Amino acid sequence: MSSTFARVRRSTALLVALFMVLATMALAGSPADAKKPDPPGQLVQLQLLAFNDYHGHVKDTDAGNIGEDPSGGGEYLSTKLKELRQGNKYTLTVAAGDLIGGSPAFSGLFHDEPSVESLNAMGLDVSSVGNHEFDEGVTELLRMQDGGCHPLDGCYFPDEPYAGADFQWLSANVVNEATGETPLPPYWIERFESIDVAFIGMTLEATDTLVAAVGIEGWDFLDEAETANALVPILKAQGVEAIIVLLHEGGSQTPAPGEINACEGISGPIVAINDALDPEIDVMVTGHTHLPYNCLLEDASGQPRIVTSSYSYGRVVSEIDLVLDKRTDDVRRDLSTAQNHAVVRAELTPDPAITKIIDKWTPLFDVAGSTPVGTITENINRGGAPTGSDRGVESPAGNLVADAQLWSTSANGAQIAFMNPGGVRSDLTYAQSDGEGDGVVTFGEAFTFQPFGNTLLTFGMTGAEIVSVLEEQCQPAGSSRPFLHLGVSEGFTYDLAKTIETGNCTSVSVTNVQLDGVPLDMNAVYAVTANNFLADGGDNFGTFATVAGPRLDGGNDLLALVNYLGTFSPVSPPSTDRVNELN
């Protein structure tokens, strides 16, 4: 062999080898072959259907709209869940709290037993506990879980005692001060083929500022992220890699009207909680703010995490399609997706199972709730558009309640009354809802409007303390709602300037405070009425709780409203010029 031929052969071989290397690199870099397909049978599909803030909306009468479309209510939510489950081998229905409490009269008059019965019929599997589950205290929450007759009202159907919830409520971050025990399980594990999936239930840490203190005495509400993170190694020690948090806390965003899948400018507590959560937690199902969103938020390791919220009152269902990998027993985030579905009544047929529950309770409700208590001349609405969406503005509804409470406690010398916006749960609408006649307000409607059964208290406050309360409308940084606008009684006025930046109230100024046209004396003492929730410092109005001196009992807040409507009918919407917003 000549040396020239050998050199040619060697050169040719090198060229062939180089070509093969380049070809292999090109193929490896092509999208079609960037990743080998998963071997058959290694992936498990798990559908999660999620909702939050049901608030006892068994009937559809006042569940509300999505855009212009009437939506929600138990009968239609149940049908939507059944529709979405079709074709899915593995499916769970989960919730993020506030399933009961703050409910319309149809459920609330009966301590939300109709609500739990409807949730059982829908096939709910597991839920976190929200702040409203504590409205009647820990003992009543345990009755709602386990069953039994109400300690005061007894059994509504003697031959059919309340059976409790078929689903499991979870609350990992609520602990007994003395024992450190939780009132309900902290987590729940379900197996799909060979893969265990854990659900951690979380109540918002601020619950002790949102419910009456007497019902939660002796219980601590811990940081959500710290509690969840502490459970991760406990779950992993049991072989669990796929971890979902059901969290009753949320955020805010600014979508277009009717848009339920956006995640635009997401802000609020959920952002900081997401940042603080262990990256081992794969999904967060959230609630509390009554807003829909469908987000992919980066966890602390930079990986995308699904975070959803599904509005309120059964108006939206979040469908989370999880892909589980048998090789890791974990969630394949790159393959998992989420979508929010509207529960539009016109597109659905009521579920007969829920209709049967409604029919069962209707005769009792007709007796208790259909009695007329007064009349109105037009709608008396909450703040925002749609109504009830903004607790940071003055509203006719809030001022009406304050007027009623001032009038009702006048015998105790009351001069000013304040009402928290979250205590007004619906509008009083002029159009008839159930055949009672236009303008007629029934006891059931009054209950739905103001359902918590608080006690009115009248006590002395200095002018300076009153101004401090008004400044506390500007909520602490990180609160779910940056500003909570108190309803104020007629004759009380002031000027207000506030700044809201990136979902937080950053400044507030209260000036020109007057009572019946006379400037408030900062050193003088005035008789103020508030419900016991506010008087105990609820909603971060801490000044109320520090006021010294006696507190005079003014009776039940709902009865104050009912008697006011009966005395002054027809009642017109109070003005919303009691507070002059300067900016």
What do the PLM-derived regions correspond to, one by one?
Residues L15-A26:
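Bacterial N-terminal signal peptides
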Residues D196, A385-T387, T493, P519:
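Short, solvent-exposed loop/turn motifs
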Residues D33-E347, G392, A397-A404, A417, ...:
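Acidic, metal/ion-coordinating pockets
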